[in-house]
């Protein structure tokens, strides 16, 4: 799959391969133990820890490689290639177990509560594991949306969590649980991209950060906002979800600074040495 003038982003290198392994090592290791009566159902047709690992690998390959593809034909080609590799490497039994897609998320478990004091120890426990079905995931997502609306004083979410919305939310949530995870969300205005990102950020325990554009907003203002963002993330150790829309690109130089954040995690000259 090579880049073309209309699909110039079809570029794949070792960075993509490393992201697959990043996803693999996020997984909850208890799910790979044999004969563990505490292990919940794997999801789909998966019946063994070996097939569970292969299902996880398939999921990560789809997130890293197939999600970059823009046409149904290309996505089908990518999926068939993945399944062919599984069949050739692991055989028919494993292939049959992972034939149905298994989705992985990190927000299925309820908040951890101290049994003695009743206080919440961890409001967003992160365990990257499979979900039994999209229906069970929808129940969790709806509960989180209801909690968000109860705690938010200004913004209220009213997302209809149909299948495609759930899949997009899973993609965003996966990226938010990774170091410097990022996504480019493309769609018509008003389709819910920002609302979905805010819900995913809330579920991940990340602080949603967005600049406030004015007529006089310039590079100096952007730097001040970025300093505030880095102080929240660096000094306070708070997870941050930086939401940046096309309407906020007041100057072409803004994109260069965003690119620096994505590539290195730093902005040259932001803080004096």
Which residues fall in each region the model found?
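Conserved AAA+/SF3 P-loop NTPase catalytic/coupling segment centered on the Walker-B
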Residues: 243-273
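Pre-Walker A (Motif I) flank of P-loop NTPase domains
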Residues: 179-183, 238-240
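Alpha-helical lid/collar subdomain of P-loop NTPases
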Residues: 1-179
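Hydrophobic anchor at the beta1->P-loop junction of P-loop NTPases
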Residues: 172, 185, 244
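Walker A/P-loop
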Residues: 181-212, 256-257, 262
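Conserved alpha-helical scaffold flanking the Walker A/P-loop in AAA+ ATPase domains
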Residues: 220-247
């Amino acid at each position: 799959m090579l880049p073309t003038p209309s699909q110039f982003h079809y570029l794949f290198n070792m960075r993509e391969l490393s992201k697959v392994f990043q996803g693999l090592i996020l997984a909850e290791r208890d799910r790979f133990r044999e004969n563990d009566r505490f292990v919940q159902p794997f999801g789909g047709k998966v019946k063994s820890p070996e097939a569970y690992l292969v299902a996880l690998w398939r999921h990560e390959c789809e997130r890293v490689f197939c999600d970059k593809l823009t046409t149904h034909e290309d996505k089908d080609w990518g999926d068939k290639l993945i399944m062919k590799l599984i069949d050739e490497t692991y055989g028919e039994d494993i292939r049959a177990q992972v034939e149905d897609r298994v989705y992985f998320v990190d927000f299925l478990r309820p908040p951890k509560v101290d049994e003695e004091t009743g206080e919440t120890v961890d409001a967003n426990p992160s365990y990257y594991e499979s979900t039994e079905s999209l229906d069970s995931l929808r129940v969790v997502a709806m509960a989180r949306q209801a909690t968000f609306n109860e705690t938010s004083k200004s913004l209220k979410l009213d997302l209809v969590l149909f299948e495609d919305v759930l899949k997009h939310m899973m993609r965003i949530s996966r990226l938010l649980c990774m170091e410097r995870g990022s996504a480019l969300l493309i769609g018509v205005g008003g389709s819910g991209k920002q609302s979905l990102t805010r819900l995913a950020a809330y579920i991940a325990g990340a602080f949603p950060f967005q600049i406030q554009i004015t007529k006089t907003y310039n590079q100096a203002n952007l730097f001040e906002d970025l300093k505030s963002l880095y102080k929240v993330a660096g000094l306070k150790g708070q997870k941050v979800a930086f939401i940046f829309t096309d309407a906020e690109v007041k100057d072409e130089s803004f994109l260069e600074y965003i690119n620096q954040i994505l590539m290195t995690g730093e902005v040259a000259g932001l803080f004096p040495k």
